[in-house]
Amino acid sequence: MPVVTTDAESETGIPKSLSNEPPSETMEEIEHTCPQPRLTLTAPAPFADETNCQCQAPHEKLTIAQARLGTPADRPVRVYADGIFDLFHSGHARALMQAKTLFPNSYLLVGVCSDDLTHKFKGFTVMNEAERYEALRHCRYVDEVIRDAPWTLTPEFLEKHKIDFVAHDDIPYSSAGSDDVYKHIKEAGMFVPTQRTEGISTSDIITRIVRDYDVYARRNLQRGYTAKELNVSFINEKRYRFQNQVDKMKEKVKNVEERSKEFVNRVEEKSHDLIQKWEEKSREFIGNFLELFGPDGAWKQMFQERSSRMLQALSPKQSPVSSPTRSRSPSRSPSPTFSWLPLKTSPPSSPKAASASISSMSEGDEDEK
């Protein structure tokens, strides 16, 4: 593994080039005892001042190409990332994830600046330094947390923590009288860029809170915080509490409206179902009625059958013309049928003439007999 030559150091004390001379035998015999990357996530990451690293092996510098090819298991690539990490959010976590996955075998050290340095160079923070330290310890990508990290990285700090590379976004970070606090790191070939996550930052979160300050103040008053704790005046406190009562009434009215709408919808659904069932029953009833009492219904057919039976029972059958009884008595002739012809008679002129005509008619009858 190449070692650093003393003649290739820049003015800042950071080595700029690497020699290809093989290490001496004494250097190979000494094993690395530096902390290894965390294999389990059941405990938070340790602080740098608690690890007590006593590794005596010389820390040989690596190029980015060598680090990407991979290193021995006992020689992880030590990557450093620093920041304020106020209101730790997903953008911070993604940046640390990128720093952790830059190389196959990496050990991620995260430096967190103290409150004094942050308030001096950047401004007031929402979380204090202890809270920010703890937030970083519980990030799964972090192997070690360095408290009170320097604002500008010095050669002594890099050598103390045996840092191979520094990971940060490539945007120049002007602060502390410098156009870019990572300029000397970039010149030394130790800078590895990461990508920022758009749409999320600590400043954006604070802007949301300030924009909706009244909403959050009312919410916290409702949850039991006092006006003194929220730094709210007496008048604003009463206004917020009154607004909370108004919102409660609005919520109740809204709930009643929603319930009434649900009730109306249920009634409409049930009435619709009821109407459908009633229509089905009506169609069934009408169909059954037509089948029974319609023009070709069963009732009419039954009435016709009964009527025909009654007619057959009431009217006897006529005997045929050539019946046996008529053939047995051939001598008997049917009685003659007489047709009375109309006679024109003049009215009798006298009672005697009328009696004479009647007597003549009776005599004629006796002669026929």
From Swiss-Prot:
CTP binds at residues 84-85, 92, 122, 168-169, 173, 195-197, 200. The modification Phosphoserine is found at residues 315, 319, 322-323, 329, 331, 335, 346, 349-350, 355, 360, 362. This is Choline-phosphate cytidylyltransferase B. Gene3D superfamilies: HUPs. Pfam families: CTP_transf_like. The keyword Ribosomal protein does not apply. It comes from Homo sapiens. SUPFAM superfamilies: Nucleotidylyl transferase. The gene is PCYT1B. GO terms for molecular function: choline-phosphate cytidylyltransferase activity; identical protein binding; phosphatidylcholine binding. InterPro entries: CCT, Cyt_trans-like, Pcy1-like, Rossmann-like_a/b/a_fold. Residues 319-339, 351-362 have a biased composition (Low complexity). Keywords: Cytoplasm, Endoplasmic reticulum, Lipid biosynthesis, Lipid metabolism, Nucleotidyltransferase, Phospholipid biosynthesis, Phospholipid metabolism, Phosphoprotein, Transferase. One of its GO terms (cellular component) is endoplasmic reticulum membrane. Residues 1-27, 309-369 are annotated as: Disordered. It catalyses: phosphocholine + CTP + H(+) = CDP-choline + diphosphate. Belongs to the cytidylyltransferase family. It is an enzyme of class 2 (transferase). The modification Phosphothreonine is found at residue 345. Phosphocholine binds at residues 122, 151. Pathway: Phospholipid metabolism; phosphatidylcholine biosynthesis; phosphatidylcholine from phosphocholine: step 1/2. GO terms for biological process: CDP-choline pathway; ovarian follicle development; phosphatidylcholine biosynthetic process; spermatogenesis. Its EC number is 2.7.7.15.
